[in-house]
């Protein structure tokens, strides 16, 4: 009888899934905004928590890269989406971020009926239950996992782009508007991957 209960519990843990979604790069001035959606069973959420999965901002780059393959291996499914700097300038960062999330969700094999999203952003259009969680990447392993997948994916792109945009130290600032990055823009000019709508606010255009 006890073995049957344990077997039933194990099956339940393997079946129950949670879909977390998060974005990264929303505040950068260069390059796309990224989003990731990660599907996890209860069992694998527990395992990833033991590995140290938490909000990507609380982890070192090395730790994030070590956790990424574990997340991808233990996830039932995952998707990554992005919106370009041009789309951000055209649509605004809010709509472009929504679009990156929708694109990540469309990469999933099955459309989820329920999502948990980090922060207050409501996806439109999206038919299904959405739960918006403030600081969700610190509270839900699925959102934390999504934040790591999105962060490492975007950082990897920034490092690759450094070859063509070496005058902006993209590998170092990851596209964010550091004082050094802004100084290099004044010196070298604006590229097609800089978000012009953001730079206007900094009076660099």
Swiss-Prot record:
Domain of life: Bacteria
Cofactor(s) this protein cannot do without: Mn(2+); Mg(2+)
Xref: CDD domains: RNase_HII_bacteria_HII_like (cd07182)
Pfam families the UniProt entry points to: RNase_HII
Swiss-Prot/TrEMBL keywords: Cytoplasm, Endonuclease, Hydrolase, Manganese, Metal-binding, Nuclease
Cellular location(s): Cytoplasm
Catalytic activity: Endonucleolytic cleavage to 5'-phosphomonoester
GO molecular function: manganese ion binding; RNA binding; RNA-DNA hybrid ribonuclease activity
Enzyme class: hydrolase
Cofactor: how and how many bound: Manganese or magnesium. Binds 1 divalent metal ion per monomer in the absence of substrate. May bind a second metal ion after substrate binding.
EC number: 3.1.26.4
RNase H type-2 domain mapped to chain residues: 16-205
Gene Ontology BP term (one): mismatch repair
Residues at which a divalent metal cation binds: 22-23, 118
GO annotation, cellular component aspect: cytoplasm; ribonuclease H2 complex
PANTHER family reported in the protein's UniProt record: RIBONUCLEASE H2 SUBUNIT A, RIBONUCLEASE HII
Role description: Endonuclease that specifically degrades the RNA of RNA-DNA hybrids.
NCBIfam families hit by this protein: PRK00015.1-3, PRK13925.1
Family, similarity comment: Belongs to the RNase HII family.
Name under which the protein is recorded: Ribonuclease HII
Species whose genome carries this gene: Prochlorococcus marinus (strain AS9601)
Biological classification of the source: Bacteria, Bacillati, Cyanobacteriota, Cyanophyceae, Synechococcales
């Amino acid at each position: 009888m006890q073995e049957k209960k344990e077997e039933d519990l194990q099956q339940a843990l393997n079946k129950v899934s949670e879909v977390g979604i998060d974005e990264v790069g929303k505040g950068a001035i260069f390059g796309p905004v990224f989003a990731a959606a990660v599907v996890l069973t209860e069992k694998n959420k527990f395992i990833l928590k033991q590995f140290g999965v938490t909000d990507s901002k609380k982890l070192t780059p090395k730790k994030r890269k070590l956790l990424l393959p574990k997340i991808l291996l233990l996830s039932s499914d995952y998707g990554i989406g992005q919106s370009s700097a041009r789309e951000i300038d055209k649509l605004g960062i809010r709509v472009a971020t929504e679009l990156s999330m929708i694109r990540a969700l469309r990469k999933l094999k099955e459309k989820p009926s329920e999502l948990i999203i980090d922060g207050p952003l409501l996806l439109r259009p999206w038919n299904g239950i959405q739960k918006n969680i403030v600081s969700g990447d610190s509270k839900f392993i699925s959102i934390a996992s999504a934040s790591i997948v999105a962060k490492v994916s975007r950082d990897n792109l920034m490092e690759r782009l450094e070859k063509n945009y070496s005058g902006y130290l993209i590998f170092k600032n990851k596209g964010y508007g550091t004082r050094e990055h802004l100084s290099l823009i004044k010196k070298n000019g604006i590229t097609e991957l800089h978000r012009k709508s953001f730079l206007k606010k900094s009076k660099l255009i």
